[in-house]
C-alpha cells in the first residue's frame, strides 16, 4: 500500500512539474520572444520598403527635412518608452496616434502613417509599445497595461502638435485591442475617434487560438 502511495505521489509531483515547466515555457514563448523581436527590429525599414515601395521616398523626404523625429518618455516603472512622429505637410490640428501589433514596432506601422500623413494631411505619432522596438520593458503586456502608456502618448501628441488637436487613435492587431482598451478610459475633449483593425476579443481567446494552431494543444 505504501509503495502505491509513493508511486501516486511521485506521479502527481512529476505531472505538476511538467505542467509548471510547460506553462513557463509557453509564457516565455508568448511574452518574451526575444529572437523574433530582435530580428524584426533589425530588418524593419528594409522589410517595409520591400512590402510598401512607396514608403522609401516619403521616409527619405521626412528624414532629409528633419520632419521625422524621435521622442522618449519614462514609463511607470522607470523604463524608456520610444516613439516617432512627424508633422503634417501643412499646419493642421488633425492628428493620428498609430498603435502597432504583437512583436511589431512603430516602423512597421509606417504604411498607416503614410495614409494619415501623406494622403490625409494629418500629424502622426507612432509609439513603440512596452518591450517593443526601441522601448524598454520586461515582457509583452498584450495591451491591458499598454493602454496607460498610449493615453500618455496621446497627451504628448496633443502637446507636440499645438495643444488643441482633433485626434484619432488607430490600432492594428494587438494595437487594435489596446486601442479599444484605451477607448474605455476617460478621454480628453480632443479625442474624436478610435479605429480598431483586427483586434482580439480577449487575451485568453487569443492564446487559446495560438495553442491550437501552433502546437495542436487543447485550451
Locations of regions flagged by a protein language model:
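Conserved alpha/beta-hydrolase
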Residues: 116-136
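Hydrolase active-site cap/lid region
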Residues: 181-219
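An N-terminal hydrophobic leader/cap segment in hydrolases
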Residues: 4, 15-73
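A short loop-to-beta-strand scaffold at the N-terminal edge of the catalytic core in hydrolase folds
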Residues: 76-87
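Short beta-strand element of the alpha/beta-hydrolase
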Residues: 93-101
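Alpha/beta-hydrolase active-site loop
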Residues: 139-161
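The serine-hydrolase catalytic nucleophile loop
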Residues: 102-116
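Alpha/beta-hydrolase fold nucleophile elbow
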Residues: 161-173
Amino acid at each position: 500500500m505504501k509503495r502505491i502511495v509513493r508511486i501516486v505521489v511521485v506521479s502527481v509531483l512529476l505531472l505538476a512539474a511538467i505542467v509548471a515547466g510547460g506553462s513557463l515555457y509557453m509564457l516565455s514563448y508568448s511574452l518574451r520572444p526575444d529572437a523574433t523581436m530582435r530580428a524584426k527590429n533589425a530588418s524593419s525599414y528594409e522589410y517595409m520598403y520591400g512590402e510598401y515601395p512607396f514608403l522609401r521616398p516619403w521616409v527619405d523626404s521626412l528624414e532629409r527635412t528633419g520632419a521625422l523625429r524621435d521622442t522618449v518618455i519614462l514609463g511607470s516603472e522607470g523604463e524608456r518608452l520610444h516613439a516617432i512622429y512627424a508633422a503634417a505637410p501643412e499646419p493642421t490640428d488633425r492628428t493620428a496616434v498609430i498603435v502597432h501589433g504583437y512583436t511589431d514596432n512603430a516602423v512597421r506601422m509606417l504604411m498607416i502613417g503614410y495614409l494619415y500623413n501623406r494622403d490625409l494631411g494629418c500629424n502622426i505619432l507612432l509609439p513603440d509599445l512596452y518591450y517593443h522596438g526601441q522601448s524598454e520593458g520586461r515582457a509583452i503586456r498584450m495591451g491591458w497595461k499598454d493602454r496607460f502608456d498610449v493615453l500618455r502618448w496621446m497627451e504628448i501628441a496633443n502637446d507636440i502638435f499645438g495643444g488643441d488637436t482633433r485626434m484619432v487613435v488607430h490600432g492594428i492587431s494587438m494595437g487594435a485591442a489596446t486601442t479599444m482598451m484605451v477607448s474605455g478610459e476617460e478621454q480628453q475633449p480632443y479625442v474624436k475617434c478610435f479605429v480598431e483593425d483586427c483586434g482580439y476579443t480577449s487575451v485568453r481567446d487569443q492564446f487559446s487560438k495560438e495553442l491550437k494552431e501552433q502546437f495542436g494543444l487543447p485550451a
